Amino acid sequence: MNMQEFKIFKDQNNSNLKFDFSLKNLNWMNIGGSAKVFFKPENLKELISFLKIVPKYKKHVLGAGSNLLISEKLGEKIFIKLGKNFSNISLIDDNKLIAGCSSLDKNVSDFACENGLSGLEFLSCIPGSVGGGIRMNSGCFGSEFKDFLVSIQVIDFEGKVSSIRTKDIIFGYRKCNLPYDLIFLSATFECKKSNKAVSYTHLTLPTMI
């Protein structure tokens, strides 16, 4: 791995690029070694610029780390974790919202309830991020990501941004057919119009025995 090109990129972009960076604090098990190169882009422009200099290297995208075991030996793989600007959540219609894929599932559920949208209450029980939820088609209490997902915006490892409709994705139990050379950027969800009080009532989920 030619570290000089990464150091030049860091100097030119003042980016959040780190070397020999421990990943232990980025997963819930607090295990794993150090990434030779770790990048946390704060916006899409930074991410595109970085991807253009790393086409020949293996890459892995990190989410919330709630369902992840990291090896002590990571080799020369590059690790990418989306920054805070990829966790924005906003309304785009009376019954639709868009969430950055580094948003925590619970934050999306809370946002929907606060805005009188029903359907995403189940996300409050899923410990993870939107991106990981899409990848695994996470779900509980009879609902899954695919039930409310309209489309996702993605970027491939060559830096090309595109949108994929849910109907063009094959979802299964805790899986989907999207290739692993895609980074999920944002997701659009369609909910049911309700009101805040009713939506929060739905958060009182059945007691597990």
Question: Which residues are covered by each model-predicted region?
Answer:
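Short, conserved charged micro-motifs
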Residues: 46-49, 195-199
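Anion-binding (especially nucleotide phosphate/pyrophosphate-binding) glycine-rich loop
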Residues: 3-130
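Short, glycine- and charge-enriched coil/turn segments that flank and shape catalytic ligand pockets
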Residues: 56, 90-96, 158-160, 180-181, ...
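Single conserved hydrophobic/aromatic residue that forms the stacking wall/gate
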Residues: 202-209
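Structural signature of FAD isoalloxazine-binding scaffolds in flavoprotein oxidoreductases
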Residues: 32-33, 39-44, 69-87, 135-165, ...
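Flexible, small-/acidic-enriched active-site or ligand-binding loops
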Residues: 168-177
